[in-house]
Amino acid sequence: MRCFRLSRHFIVYLFSLCAILLLAGCVQSRGGFVSKNHVVLAEQNPNTHFEQEVMIVRLSQVLLVGKMSNEERASLHFERGVLYDSLGLWGLARYDLTQALALQPKMASVYNYLGLYLLLEEDYDGALDAFNTVFELDSGYDYTHLNRGLNFYYVGRYHLAQQDFLQFYQADKKDPYRVLWLYLNEQKLKPQEAQTNLVERAKGLSEDFWGTHIVQYYLGHISVEELQQRASEFAENSQQYAEILTETYFYLAKQKLNVGLVDEAAALFKLAMANQVYNFVEYRFAAFELMKLKPVQTEDEKEEKSAVTKAIVF
């Protein structure tokens, strides 16, 4: 079984690598993370998730044979669901989280996860209900302000998103990711103030976060080539490098998308997913952004086909 698991992961990695190399030609760059002949990816180790896989087996055994209270069983379902989520097995994660909720209907953390899954399925009303329930159960659940803010952001209710993103930022002003989402929202809500606010908020950021360097890039203080160099220096191991690249490609993609470079943004979103950091916000919403871009790309393809048809007829 061990040999089979290793070979399967290796084959998936090779397939993904080939697909990503094809994307490089879609992104025009003078250098840095992506060029026509070069794509920066983290090294993939087939054993990266071995500990999570072992823990899932152990939790499954306990759930099958263990005698416990509903509260204990709900906790185990939640733990296994979070592990499944970290492996990108979102269907299995959702099943476990639903089981946990059936046993313990007042688990705020479960509603937070389920709300996120509903958001990623574009069930915005269902997601909003779930996030509101989190606050009813636990008013101090900080990260739900981010998730509910994202829900508002993606339906264009930027004034409501601003309230949640601002509250999320005020809870930790040293966190650059809170600053980045405020900036992205303000580009839609009040673009004339977004850059000025980013400059001001950047002053209080911690250098302990990789995202601080992304903010410096957004401000124009460093080039994409310098950003790449800092990324390789910042990462202490291949897993951290994968996380850094996931974040970086996502925010580079958002920058491209905001200036109308849809094809380049799509390629960068795919690269954000290539490092397989499934439980990062940036991975989840890279997949979400790609899903939202499909109708746009489909309409473009229809127009091209229509133009070709007219050319043939006339």
Swiss-Prot record:
UniProt repeat feature TPR, residue ranges: 74-107, 108-141, 246-279
Q: Name one GO biological process term.
A: cell division
Query: Where does the signal sequence lie?
Result: 1-25
Q: Where is the lipid attached (N-palmitoyl cysteine)?
A: 26
Q: Record's superkingdom?
A: Bacteria
Lipid-anchored residues (S-diacylglycerol cysteine)? 26
InterPro entries recorded: Lipoprotein_NlpI, TPR-like_helical_dom_sf, TPR_rpt, Ycf3
Topology of the protein relative to the lipid bilayer:
Lipid-anchor
Gene Ontology cellular component?
A: cell outer membrane; plasma membrane
Q: Where, by residue number, does the polypeptide cross the bilayer? A: none
The entry's function note states: May be involved in cell division.
The protein's name is Lipoprotein NlpI homolog
Name its species.
Haemophilus influenzae (strain ATCC 51907 / DSM 11121 / KW20 / Rd)
